[in-house]
A protein has these predicted regions:
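CheY-like receiver
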Residues: 12-16, 53, 93
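Conserved Rossmann-fold cofactor-binding substructure of NAD(P)-dependent oxidoreductases
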Residues: 1-19
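A generic structural motif
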Residues: 1, 201-210
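Redox-cofactor binding/interface segments in oxidoreductases and associated redox assembly factors
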Residues: 19-22, 65
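A hydrophobic C-terminal alpha-helical subdomain
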Residues: 172, 208-273
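Non-catalytic, hydrophobic alpha-helical segments
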Residues: 20, 157, 189, 259-262
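Oxidoreductase cofactor-interface core, primarily capturing Rossmann-like NAD(P)-dependent enzymes
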Residues: 5-8, 26-42, 57-61, 69-200, ...
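Short, conserved SAM-binding segment of the class I
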Residues: 46-49, 53
Length: 273
């Protein structure tokens, strides 16, 4: 069993592997440190450990690194989303230090999960004293902010990984793949949540400082991500070097569950919980 903090254990775990799918968990150390930048440094080192171990795995044919765009670079230095930029630093390491591994690498951008509605900062709630029977979602960003989403990651992610592995001529050599089923606005997503959950909804934009006071630390981490998406819009899932980002259409991926179907399943599970 490999430990992303232990290079030697990773080398042992990877021995004999032909395909490696690597993902780190930013929010595990974040829950202990409550510090985004410090957690990003931990995640960066974990990713470098994984890359170094993969690079010396002689049997390796394809390396898939689950990463995210460099928000600091894309936004021209205006934003830095820790759980994005720590991962993106590993991309830079692979490109600069591991050329042989780069030839076998797909950089996979996994977008917003539909289960993120379970995060307190996203969860719509009923206002007990309100006359209207609506569920409210609070946020400090525009309701027109676009959210690219993979929907149900458990059902859809594997199709992107398989497509990348089966088409290395497109997806290897350091190519970026965007794992998204659709893009929808914040307001549109909330409306769809309401329709699938049988609730009336309303998005209420509030002051950024007030938003962060309601959910300290977590709102800072996720709030800066939403602000980044709001500011950069269609550029948010792009590479500053101009490299093409492959989509589901580019890879011919079919049979993906739609976001609406995923939210219906989520509503059914919530109702029976």
């Amino acid at each position: 069993q490999g430990d992303s903090n232990d290079l030697a254990s990773l080398k042992t775990a990877f021995a004999g592997s032909h395909i490696i799918f690597a993902v780190t968990n930013f929010f595990e150390p974040f829950a202990k440190l409550f510090d985004g930048p410090k957690t990003a440094e931990i995640e960066k080192q974990q990713g470098i450990n994984i890359a170094q171990a993969a690079a010396v795995t002689d049997s390796l044919e394809h390396f898939i690194w689950s990463t995210l765009p460099n928000s600091h670079a894309v936004s021209g230095g205006k934003f830095s989303v820790p759980h994005f930029d720590g991962k993106a630093s590993v991309d830079d390491y692979i490109r600069e230090k591991e050329p042989a591994l780069l030839a076998k690498t797909t950089f996979l951008w996994v977008t917003w999960y539909h289960t993120n509605y379970s995060f307190p900062v996203y969860t719509p709630f009923k206002v007990p004293t309100a006359f209207a029977d609506v569920h409210v979602q609070l946020g400090s960003w525009s309701p027109e902010t676009p959210i690219s989403t993979i929907g149900d990651v458990r059902l859809n992610l594997g199709k992107f990984v398989r497509a990348a592995v089966e088409q290395p001529e497109k997806a290897a050599n350091g190519a970026y793949v965007l794992a998204a089923v659709e893009t929808i606005t914040v307001e549109g997503l909330l409306k769809l949540w309401g329709e699938t959950h049988g609730k009336k909804t309303k998005y209420v934009k509030i002051d950024p400082e007030a938003f962060r006071e309601l959910w300290p630390v977590l709102a800072e981490e996720l709030g800066v991500m939403m602000d980044y998406w709001d500011a950069t819009r269609e550029k948010s899932w792009s590479d500053v070097s101009g490299r093409k980002v492959l989509t589901k259409e580019d890879l011919g991926i079919q049979g993906l569950q739609t976001l609406e179907e995923g939210l219906k399943d989520l509503a059914a599970k919530t109702a029976t919980a």
